[in-house]
Amino acid sequence: MRVTTSFPLGTLRDTPSEAEIISHQLLLKAGYIRRVNSGIYAYMPLMLRVVEKISAIIEKELNSIGCTKLLLPQLHPADLWKKSERWEGYTAGEGIMFNLKDRQGKEFGLAPTHEEVITSIASETINSYKQLPQCFYQIQTKFRDEIRPRFGLMRSREFIMKDGYSFHSSENDLASFYEKVGNAYENIFESCGLQTVGVDADSGAIGGASSKEFMVTADAGEDSILFTQSGSYAANIEKAVSLPSQPIPLKDNIAEWLETPNQKTIQEVCDNNNLDPSQIIKVVILLAQFENEFNAPILACVRGDQHINEVKLFNLINKLHHFNLLNLKKIEDKNTIEKNLVDLPLGFIGPDLDNKTIKASSNWEKKWTRIIDHSASDLSKFISGGNKVNFHKVFQEFSFNSKNYLIGDIRNAKKGDKISIDDDEELKEKKGIEIGHIFQLGQKYSEKLNAKFSDKDGQLKNLWMGCYGIGVTRIAQAAIEQNHDQKGICWPIQISPFEVIIIPTNLKDPIQSDLTEQIYNNFLINKIDVLLDDRNDRAGVKFKDAELIGIPFQVIIGRDSINKEVELFCRTNNTKIKISTDKLLETFISESEIMYNKKS
């Protein structure tokens, strides 16, 4: 390919102001993507080649374990999503599905994921155990109405994803295939030149019994990973479990009531009363909004030195009611409080808050759903809000069971926690970028969409399902987070748009021009993925662009061309060798093979 005719380089001299993280900055500056609108990007020719190379790696690996590629519609009828009971959750409030009505008034959604459609198809095409197992996958554009698109392709409204779905006759067969896909994912990410870690994860809106995320560790990551140094445990903070540190016991001579004027935070109470946060129970009030406009006020308690994990809390609340939970948010809006609550001592709320604080005129449930974390319920003596402005209270032998509290794990595990009583190993923390996620869905969708098969005994059974996603465009950006320097991108050769770029310093020199064409054609004949920078720009401009776009190897043709010598520069490790042109191809192939075979 030639820059002048096939691959114009749209590089920028200045860093775009809207880009917050380095990978986003470099994708824009190097001309790989162009912003069309918030969270919407055009993939320019260089970027498309990266996407195609990643897709080819994915296809090769998935095909090797028996998966079959197809293409599903992006426009989904609402009826399918209503059958799975996900329509309202994905379209109401902060739901992420773009939705519309056609000329006849029928509702549709732009696909953020495809569980409903593939299950509907499976219900029509799979009818016997003899057809199982089966796994289908596709690579296509997905749409998500992100509240705050940011970080380029990391959190965009339109992105390219590989999503796969498997169908099985038994839970054991699903579990076995789930592990096989997990191994395939590790091969895929290694083949893309990435360093990844697999972590236990929350299944979120997709659902299912268990799931695993694949993370690229990077400072720009939005997720927190907790792990042990030995590798025995790793989990997303949303899912991670641990043992909290031991609390400091309260002194015996402390007064029952503490006057705490304007001390509304845990730290303020501790600083003014010589207390430790582990001696306090923090109370947070939230509103759970369900389908059918059912609203339940939540009173959640956690030890003062811990933080509530809203994902764990959401999942726990969702299991308590017949309706699907759509949203969970803190009660802090003044109008909401005045309309629904009375005599609420904000900042001084205790675990024994009376149900009478909920107004009779409110459309909320007329009692608090009370939930407490294990770390707090174990305290025999603690301080909490006194349900009276400017006062906290000492609670002794407070029976959470008798107060209708649900006791569970609703706290964030954190760095320094131990993973179990029998293991002294402490958790460490890193930031990560999720690039893959696999789920054991069980029978959640097959049951609701009536996808059944006939077993060996002729009995109709619900299909067992798995779901497997990879963010194709996320892989590209995550690779840049792990592979860049001050000058630009340093692509892993496996997914680089080209393996080598040829840079003649002066094409007006006939010797350089002839040698450039010879080398270029020789590379093409030997099926080397080569880009020729045949612009008449200054050499400095070409070098700067080459370093910015990050192609792994550069062949620099300069004054030594008269002696049939060129320079072979490796962008990855910044090494340069002078070499005769008759040894160039052999040396390049040898050096590039080392890169291809290098483990990430």
Swiss-Prot record:
The keyword Repeat does not apply. The keyword Chloroplast does not apply. It is found in: Cytoplasm. SUPFAM superfamilies: Class II aaRS ABD-related (SSF52954), Class II aaRS and biotin synthetases (SSF55681), YbaK/ProRS associated domain (SSF55826). It holds the Pfam family tRNA_edit. Its EC number is 6.1.1.15. Transmembrane segments: none annotated. GO terms for molecular function: aminoacyl-tRNA deacylase activity; ATP binding; proline-tRNA ligase activity. One of its GO terms (biological process) is prolyl-tRNA aminoacylation. Homodimer. Catalyzes the attachment of proline to tRNA(Pro) in a two-step reaction: proline is first activated by ATP to form Pro-AMP and then transferred to the acceptor end of tRNA(Pro). As ProRS can inadvertently accommodate and process non-cognate amino acids such as alanine and cysteine, to avoid such errors it has two additional distinct editing activities against alanine. One activity is designated as 'pretransfer' editing and involves the tRNA(Pro)-independent hydrolysis of activated Ala-AMP. Belongs to the class-II aminoacyl-tRNA synthetase family. ProS type 1 subfamily. This is Proline--tRNA ligase. The gene is proS.
